[in-house]
């Protein structure tokens, strides 16, 4: 049996048309976007398709591994709040969860990927500059030598693909914008396809193998560049006869969000700080809303040509059967729901509902149909692609389990029966699960894009510091499901969405200990208490714009409780436990941002003198590695008075130096004492002249102060659980 070729065409940030899109925009889509129109006219369109996760980085491995973030591990997006090396970033790890590339490679396919990847940090780095190696200029001129370097390095090989040419089209530079890169991506792919088809015609055995091709385009993602592109002189996109009509504001633009989870209003009040001075950036958006919405739709036009050139090359080849998928990684809120932007801290349809279309070409072409009533998910891609290609999931799973540690049954559905217009009863009853833990603005340095651009990342001035969404939970999960009156009174056979906003200490900035809960002036704040769950409930048939949160409507109590149980079941069924846990790393602020109590200038001078003669010498070889899976115990004294009636205790630096050396390396540290409770600290050791810089940290560190007040009794300690036990000195220790 000859297996068909499989082609996946992706865009970035393209939402499905919302229900409030008017007739003029629908007409514009048909006229100006021929690539999308071709898929509509030749394939099966799933109008209720959901991403599975948000945002960019978590969504892509959800699509390409067929699993949710709690299994594949990728939960955070770099960009505004984090750079690629941020301690809180979690890129897909090799050798754990196989990608669709691995699945098809195991079946004998060639697997080729070109365009935006954004699942691992795959850029080649120039060792001299420390910057990604470019493959094109801002004018779109190709740097052939660097393209060759990427092809030779083959950075995606361990993730199941070849052919990728970086760097990621990500960031503010024009050279990495979709405006420049999408055409270059399309040109490379068309060249690759034409060569492949030509070699097949000549009987080349290697070329005759079926292939999986991913063509991953950027736009309409350039909408994130709007603050810089709002002025016409800075915008590379020129007016066109095919410009979209004026895009009206969404009907939820002015809702006050008072009935929604608190994270949404907190995110609204924090988002702009990711770019730069909050109030200034906010004004740019609010004064240019029409231009903002119009640009988003115009960017659909920019990428339609590159999509169509790939599509025409594939559909023009009549010798082979090909299955084409078209989708996007996520959508965009575009000012809906009270003025929310992008796709974080919500599961609204504008952010989670995206195009999903399947076309089969060849001897048995697909018949055009639109499926309106069945919810589908990104996790359905791999089962559907395998099913339509005639490949056995169980057989391939056994083969992959020899090479990967996290091979689990795929949670998605094979949608191929729907392509064949077979019985859809089973699909009508399904629940579609989705989740996100993407706390995008929370990173190590809390530096806005402008601060980083100006070289102020480690110590940004207050106006250029990111404000994290304050005092809210940052995890969301939800389901979309049809509920009958038999299931729950009030369901009415309608399609419902239930969303839970929840806190999870395992994901805190200091996991299990405390969470960064505010970074607004005058000081950073943490919390160590868990925020209660908050809920959203929407009837998607009667309220498709998700305006009325029905979670507290007593008339819908049965529907709410029924869906709560369904959500709990789906979460357990759809997200299996990892074989090898991957705990979250602790946030690591730069040294410049670590709070300290500075001594006054005279004391500072005397401290420097004492350091030169040997007190608290500087560590000339600081430890730089990570020891995240280790635990340490520091044992101190309870004895606070000498027999001669002088106060005593542990000399502070004997405790603070090992404590901060351990914690800065990622080690979890407990404090213990013979009796438990208050640890005695020699007051002389905390005087401005005699204390160390570690003591300066202690004096403003509420967490360590709490540990000092509530040390663990040695009688309650199991020493076997610790990798290091350190006995802190001090006169009082001799009395214990």
Predicted regions and their residues:
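Catalytic-site neighborhoods of secreted/periplasmic enzymes
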Residues: 65-187, 191-208, 225-228, 428
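Substrate-binding rim/cap in mid-to-C-terminal beta-strand-loop elements of soluble/periplasmic
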Residues: 64, 162-175, 308, 343-425, ...
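Core domains of carbohydrate- and sulfate-ester-processing enzymes
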Residues: 47, 59-60, 107, 121-171, ...
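Active-site-proximal cap/lid insertion segments
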Residues: 13-29, 203-209, 217-375, 388-391, ...
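C-terminal, low-complexity/hydrophilic appendages and adjacent surface loops
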Residues: 349, 436-551
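Short, structured active-site-proximal loop/turn typified by the sulfatase FGly-forming signature C/S-X-P-X-R
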Residues: 20-60, 66-71, 110-111, 560, ...
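Extended, subdomain-level signal for the structured scaffold at the beginning of enzyme domains
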Residues: 591-735
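Active-site-proximal N-terminal segment of extracellular/periplasmic enzymes that hydrolyze or transfer
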Residues: 1-47, 533, 545, 550-556
């Amino acid at each position: 049996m000859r297996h068909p070729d499989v082609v996946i065409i992706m865009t970035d940030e393209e939402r499905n048309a919302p229900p409030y899109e008017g007739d003029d925009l629908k007409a514009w889509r048909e006229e100006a976007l021929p690539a999308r129109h071709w898929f509509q006219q030749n394939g099966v369109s799933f109008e209720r398709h959901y991403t599975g996760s948000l945002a960019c980085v978590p969504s892509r491995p959800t699509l390409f591994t067929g699993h949710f973030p709690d299994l594949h591990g990728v939960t955070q997006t770099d960009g505004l709040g984090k750079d690629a090396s941020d301690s809180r970033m979690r890129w897909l790890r090799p050798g754990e969860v196989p990608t669709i590339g691995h699945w098809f490679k195991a079946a004998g396919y060639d697997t080729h990927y070109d365009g935006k990847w954004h699942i691992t940090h795959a850029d080649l780095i120039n060792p001299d500059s420390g910057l990604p190696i470019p493959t094109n200029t801002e004018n779109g001129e190709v740097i052939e030598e660097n393209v060759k370097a990427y092809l030779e390095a083959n950075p995606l090989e361990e993730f199941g693909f070849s052919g990728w040419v970086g760097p990621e089209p990500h960031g503010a530079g024009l050279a990495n914008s979709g405006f420049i890169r999408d055409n270059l991506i399309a040109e490379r792919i068309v060249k690759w396809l034409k060569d492949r088809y030509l070699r097949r015609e000549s009987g080349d055995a290697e070329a005759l193998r079926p292939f999986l091709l991913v063509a991953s385009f950027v736009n309409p993602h350039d909408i994130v560049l709007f603050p810089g592109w709002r002025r016409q002189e800075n915008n590379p996109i020129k007016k066109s006869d095919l410009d979209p009509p004026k895009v009206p504001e969404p009907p939820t633009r002015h809702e006050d969000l008072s009935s929604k989870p608190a994270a949404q209003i907190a995110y609204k009040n924090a988002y702009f700080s990711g770019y730069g001075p909050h109030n200034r950036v906010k004004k740019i958006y609010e004064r240019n809303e029409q231009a903002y919405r119009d640009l988003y739709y115009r960017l659909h036009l920019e990428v339609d040509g590159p999509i169509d050139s790939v599509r025409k090359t594939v559909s023009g080849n009549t010798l082979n059967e090909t299955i084409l998928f078209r989708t996007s990684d996520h959508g965009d809120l575009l000012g809906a729901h009270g003025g929310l932007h992008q796709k974080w801290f919500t599961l609204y349809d504008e952010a989670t509902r995206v195009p999903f279309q399947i076309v089969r070409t060849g001897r048995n072409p697909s018949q055009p149909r639109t499926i309106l009533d069945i919810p589908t998910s990104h996790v359905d891609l791999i089962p559907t692609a395998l099913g339509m290609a005639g490949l056995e999931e169980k057989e391939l799973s056994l083969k992959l389990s020899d090479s990967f540690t996290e091979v689990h049954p795929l949670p998605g559905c094979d949608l191929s029966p729907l392509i064949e217009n077979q019985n859809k009863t089973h699909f009508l009853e399904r629940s579609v699960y989705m989740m996100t833990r993407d706390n995008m603005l929370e990173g190590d340095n809390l530096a806005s894009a402008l601060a980083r651009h100006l070289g102020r990342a480690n110590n940004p001035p207050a106006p250029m510091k990111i404000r994290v969404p304050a005092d809210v939970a940052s995890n969301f999960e939800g389901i979309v499901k049809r509920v009958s009156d038999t299931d729950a009174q009030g369901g009415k056979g309608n399609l419902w969405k239930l969303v839970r906003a929840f806190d999870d200490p395992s994901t805190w900035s200091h996991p299990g200990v405390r969470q960064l809960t505010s970074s607004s002036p005058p000081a950073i704040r943490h919390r160590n208490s868990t925020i209660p769950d908050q809920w959203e409930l929407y009837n998607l048939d009667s309220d498709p714009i998700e305006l009325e949160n029905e979670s507290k409507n007593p008339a819908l109590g049965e529907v709410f409780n029924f869906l709560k149980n369904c959500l709990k079941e789906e979460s357990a069924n759809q997200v299996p436990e990892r074989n090898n846990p991957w705990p979250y790393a602790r946030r690591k602020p730069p040294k410049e941002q670590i709070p300290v109590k500075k001594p006054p200038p005279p004391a500072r001078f005397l401290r420097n003198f004492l350091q030169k003669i040997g007190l608290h010498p500087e560590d000339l070889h600081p430890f730089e590695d990570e020891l995240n899976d280790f635990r340490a115990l520091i044992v101190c004294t309870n004895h606070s008075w000498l027999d001669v009636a002088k106060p005593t205790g542990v000399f502070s630096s004997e405790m603070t130096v090992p404590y901060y050396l351990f914690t800065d390396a990622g080690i979890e540290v407990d404090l213990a004492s013979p009796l438990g409770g208050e640890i005695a600290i020699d007051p002389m050791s905390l005087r401005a002249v005699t204390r160390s810089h570690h003591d300066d940290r202690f004096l403003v560190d509420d967490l360590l102060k709490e540990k000092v007040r509530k040390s663990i009794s040695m009688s309650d300690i199991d020493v076997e659980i610790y990798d290091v036990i350190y006995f802190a000195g001090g006169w009082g220790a001799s009395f214990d």
